[in-house]
Amino acid sequence: GVIGTYYASEAGFEKNIADVCKDHYAPLGPSDEVPNSPISIVVALADKIDTLTSFWAINEKPTGSKDPFALRRSALGLIRIIIENDIRISLSDILALGNDGADIEDLKYFIHQRMKVFLRDQSLRHDLIDACLSLDKGDDLALLVKKSFALMDFIETSDGSNLIQGFKRANNILLQAEQNDGVEYSYGADPKYAEEEAERNLFYALDNEEVKIRSALEKENFVEAMNSMANLRTPIDIFFETVQINSDVDITRRNR
């Protein structure tokens, strides 16, 4: 690649074209710099996508410690190029472009596992990555990383702790009720069945914070969105402390 760059320069090619000869191999290791010029990025990604999809198409995958075709390195290179250049692109779409009969979902899973290893070295917890992966199937790697780091920073704050405790309290009651009633409470509650002031206040808080949460998510301000969710802890606590969940009236109990 380096020699190719020299030859291309001597042949009169522009520098950004000549540099592609060496840049499309990058990064060769976890500490190597990634390509950052548009042409080099495109060719480097295409090279790695072609390598991965081609080997997946013939069912040649890394097993254990064996990786004779350096596919883990190709996957890590693809991940780093996307993340470090903040490229907003669908992983499924770009893998489909190079698909020669490869199992795209299996290849995505492999790439996600490599990304977990890469991010673990940056002190990001696996369970946080898994939580973010569950939301949108991890198609946008750059966005996934932003969400994961925002979540990690948030849960270490008092607001984060409040949010988790509020969720646990509500979720435990729901799980127990679903088990006892044999139904799934996935539908929303209806304000018209709210009898107590704490119930009505909780509905108001939910509606109020939902507007803020949606706005924050549209701006990809995930910390702001989670702060708004954490604001629900107080009305949730008051609801649990002052309202009898297990009402004698069945429709009221189910709504609560």
Task: Name every feature range the model reports, one short phrase each.
Residues 1-256:
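Amphipathic alpha-helical "coupling" segments that flank catalytic cores
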